[in-house]
C-alpha cells in the first residue's frame, strides 16, 4: 500500500494550489502538445499552398502550370491523409497518459489525508510526529464519492483530448479547400490568422451547471481544486465528529468572494443544530452560551465551497476566540484578485498566439503582445502590492 506522510502545518491554500496545478498541468501539457502537432501540419500545408501557381490577371494557367498545380494538390491530399492518421494516433497516446481514475483517486486521497491530519493536530490528537498513513485509511474512504465525481469529470476531458488533434486538423483543412488555396476567397495572410486564432482557443466547449464556459485547462484545474478542497474539508470534519466535535468555523483569505465572506468567522454546526446552546467551556470548568449562526449544509447551499474555493473548516472550541470573527467582505480586494487573474489570462493568451503563429510576422506580433501584457502585470502589482504568481502565467497553467 502506498504511504504518505501528511503535514498538518500546510495551509489549505497551498494544498489546493499544488494538487489543482498538477491536474491542470497534466491536461494542459496534453493540449499544448496536440496544438503544436496540429500547428506544424497546418504550417506545412500553408507552405505547400504558397507554391501553387497563380494565373496572371485576365489569363489562365499554362499547361506546365496546370501540371504543377495538380502535382501540389495531390501532394497536399497525400500529406493530409498521413496527418489525419498520425494525429489520430497522437490523440490516443495523449489520452492514455492521463489515467483519470488513478489521478483522481490519488489526489483526492492526498487531500483527505492532509485535511484529517490538520484537524487531528488542531484537536491535540496529532502532532508533528505523525506516522505515514496508508491510502486505505478512513480519510480516503470518506472522500471516495469526491474521487468518483472527479474521475467522471476528468474522463470527459480525456475523451476530448482523444478526438481533438484529428478534429482540429479537419477543421483547418476545411478552411483550406482548393478554392481558398487558389485565392478565390480569402488571402493566405487572412487564412493564416484564422488558423492561428482557432488553434489559440485550444480545446473549448466545457459548460458547468451555471452555464459558464471553460477551456480544457481551466475546467481540469477547477475540477481538481474543487475536489481537493471538498475532500480536505470533509475529511477534517469527519475527524472532528469522530472526536465529539460538532461545531466549526470557517476561515478564508482577505480577498474572499461575496459568496464566502458572509460565512467566514461564523460558528456552524455539522449536525444541524442552530441558535443558542449551552456547552462546557473549552478550558474552564463552567458552561458557556454559544450562538450557532447556521449549519455547514446551509453555508454550502448559499454558495460557500463553490468551484475554486479555498476556505477551510476549523474546529470550534466553546468560549475561545474565533479567528476572523469580525471578517467583512472587501469588494476592492476581490476585484484586485479577479484583475490579477484576468491579466494572467491575457499573458497566457498572448503566449498561446505566439505558439500557434503560422507566419514570422504573426509570431513577432504575438511576441509584442506578450511583452505588453507582462508590462501591464508589473504595473498592476506595483500599484496594488499583490504578489506575482509567475507559474500562473505559463502556457501549461489553466485558463481559470
Question: How should each PLM-predicted stretch be described?
Answer:
Residues 1-199, 319-320, 324-400:
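N-terminal leader/targeting and assembly helices and adjacent pre-domain segments
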Residues 191-212, 227:
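The feature marks a conserved, polyanion-engaging helical scaffold used by nucleic-acid processing enzymes
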Residues 206, 214-318:
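Acidic, glycine-rich two-metal-ion catalytic cores of nucleic acid-processing enzymes
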Amino acid at each position: 500500500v502506498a504511504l504518505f506522510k501528511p503535514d498538518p502545518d500546510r495551509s489549505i491554500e497551498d494544498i489546493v494550489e499544488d494538487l489543482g496545478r498538477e491536474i491542470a498541468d497534466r491536461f494542459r501539457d496534453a493540449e499544448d502538445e496536440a496544438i503544436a502537432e496540429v500547428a506544424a501540419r497546418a504550417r506545412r500545408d500553408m507552405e505547400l499552398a504558397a507554391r501553387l501557381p497563380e494565373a496572371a490577371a485576365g489569363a489562365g494557367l499554362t499547361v506546365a502550370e496546370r501540371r504543377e498545380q495538380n502535382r501540389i494538390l495531390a501532394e497536399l491530399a497525400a500529406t493530409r491523409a498521413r496527418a489525419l492518421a498520425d494525429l489520430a494516433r497522437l490523440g490516443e497516446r495523449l489520452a492514455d497518459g492521463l489515467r483519470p481514475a488513478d489521478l483522481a483517486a490519488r489526489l483526492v486521497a492526498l487531500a483527505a489525508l492532509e485535511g484529517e491530519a490538520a484537524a487531528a493536530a488542531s484537536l491535540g490528537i496529532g502532532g508533528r510526529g505523525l506516522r505515514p498513513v496508508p491510502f486505505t485509511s478512513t480519510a480516503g474512504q470518506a472522500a471516495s464519492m469526491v474521487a468518483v465525481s472527479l474521475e467522471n469529470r476528468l474522463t470527459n476531458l480525456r475523451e476530448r483530448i482523444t478526438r481533438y488533434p484529428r478534429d482540429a486538423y479537419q477543421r483547418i483543412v476545411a478552411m483550406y479547400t482548393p478554392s481558398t488555396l487558389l485565392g478565390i476567397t480569402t488571402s493566405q495572410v487572412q487564412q493564416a490568422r484564422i488558423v492561428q486564432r482557432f488553434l489559440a482557443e485550444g480545446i473549448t466547449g466545457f459548460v458547468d451547471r451555471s452555464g459558464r464556459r471553460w477551456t480544457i485547462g481551466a475546467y481540469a484545474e477547477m475540477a481538481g481544486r474543487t475536489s481537493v478542497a471538498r475532500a480536505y474539508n470533509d475529511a477534517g470534519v469527519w475527524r472532528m465528529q469522530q472526536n465529539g466535535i460538532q461545531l466549526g468555523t470557517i476561515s478564508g483569505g482577505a480577498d474572499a468572494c461575496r459568496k464566502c465572506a458572509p460565512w467566514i468567522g461564523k460558528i456552524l454546526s455539522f449536525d444541524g443544530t442552530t441558535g443558542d446552546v449551552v456547552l462546557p467551556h473549552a478550558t474552564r470548568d463552567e458552561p458557556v452560551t454559544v450562538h450557532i449562526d447556521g449549519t455547514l449544509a446551509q453555508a454550502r447551499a448559499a454558495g460557500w465551497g463553490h468551484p475554486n474555493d479555498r476556505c477551510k473548516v476549523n474546529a470550534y472550541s466553546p468560549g475561545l476566540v474565533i479567528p476572523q470573527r469580525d471578517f467583512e467582505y472587501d469588494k476592492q480586494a476581490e476585484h484586485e484578485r479577479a484583475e490579477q487573474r484576468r491579466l494572467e489570462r491575457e499573458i497566457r493568451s498572448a503566449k498561446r498566439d505566439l505558439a500557434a503563429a503560422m507566419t514570422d510576422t504573426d509570431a513577432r506580433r504575438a511576441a509584442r503582445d506578450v511583452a505588453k501584457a507582462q508590462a501591464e502585470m508589473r504595473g498592476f502589482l506595483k500599484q496594488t502590492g499583490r504578489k506575482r504568481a509567475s507559474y500562473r502565467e505559463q502556457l501549461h497553467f489553466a485558463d481559470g
